[in-house]
Amino acid sequence: MPLFNSILDTIGRTPIVRLQRMAPEHTSVYVKVESFNPGGSVKDRLALSVVLDAEAKGLLKPGDTIVECTSGNVGIALAMVAAARGYRFVAVMGDTYSVERRKLIRAYGGKLVLFPGHLGSKGGNLIADELAEKYGWFRARQFDNPANPSYHRETTASEILADFAGKRLDHFVTGFGTTGTLTGVGQMLRVARPEVRVVALEPSNAAMLARGEWSPHQIQGLAPNFVPGVLDRSVIDDLVTMDEVTARDTSRRLAAEEGIFAGISAGATVATALSIAEHAPEGTVLLAMLPDTGERYLSTFLFDGVDEGSDDAWLASLDTGSGL
């Protein structure tokens, strides 16, 4: 193991793991586990790329403040990168997102400006713009910044291509969020592995790409209420929707059956991959992105109905044999 000069040097090179119990036997379903990034999500890549790009262009200097509208993961990642690079960070975030996200941002020294969640990302971006203009802060502009998909072309896509070099890969499944992963990886697959079908998913009650419709939903991190500027629609082969209950239940299954604790959007990508795999030809290979860890959803509907007390009834049942 090498010695690293900065925690930021550990971003990327996340593992790809085969599902052993959830996938149909006639297929192979793999997942790219982005929670292995130091900030716990794929958004570490975006945050680092935006900051390095801004530094190279002379848009950031030590002590400056970065501000961004975020559903949480980008905010956590930017707060981490800002701490490591000597900047301040302010997150503009809807009040419907999990409290874990707020606490993690504050743990990295960031500040929070909350707004009513029903305004969606569009409303939050307007607030972030106003703050940036008023105080002279740097706007990361994750939805429009070309550094976002560029970094995914250079790192995420390169990692996938290296890991599947000389191996079969039929489907790549990812969610509709900032679309940095979708666009960056999709563009590279188009060139290097054109046989791979790129599958984009969005919540069934917030199908901006499929129907131009949006309503508040519980798959945090997916589906802003607008179409990001960095999106390259031409990379999408299949556009599907996923209901939030199936996403939640699949996330729970990932932890209980595979030992992989991932967030609700990860449940959505895996549920989509499993649905495709169910009817796919023998030997089909699929890869689904797992954007983050489930630990930042402990206060959300991911854990609705989960008992927080002692399992005394189960323990007592062992004496009668009914708990075995």
Swiss-Prot record:
Q: What is the effect of changing K43A?
A: Loss of catalytic activity, no longer binds N6-(pyridoxal phosphate)lysine
- Catalytic reaction list: hydroxyurea + O-acetyl-L-serine = O-ureido-L-serine + acetate + H(+); O-acetyl-L-serine + hydrogen sulfide = L-cysteine + acetate
Q: What is the effect of changing V74T?
A: KM for OAS is 61 mM, KM for H(2)S is unchanged
InterPro entries recorded: Cys_synth, Cys_Synth/Cystath_Beta-Synth, CysK, P-phosphate_BS, TrpB-like_PALP, TrpB-like_PALP_sf
SUPFAM superfamilies given for it?
A: Tryptophan synthase beta subunit-like PLP-dependent enzymes (SSF53686)
Q: What is the uppermost EC class here?
A: transferase
Q: Which PROSITE patterns match?
A: CYS_SYNTHASE
Report residues binding pyridoxal 5'-phosphate.
N73, G177, T178, T179, G180, T181, S265
**What EC number(s) does its UniProt record assign?**
2.6.99.3, 2.5.1.47
Task: List the keywords (alphabetical).
Answer: Amino-acid biosynthesis, Antibiotic biosynthesis, Cysteine biosynthesis, Pyridoxal phosphate, Transferase
Q: How does it assemble?
A: Homotetramer.
Q: What family name appears in the similarity comment? A: Belongs to the cysteine synthase/cystathionine beta-synthase family.
- NCBIfam families xrefs: cysK, cysKM
Q: What is this protein called?
A: O-ureido-L-serine synthase
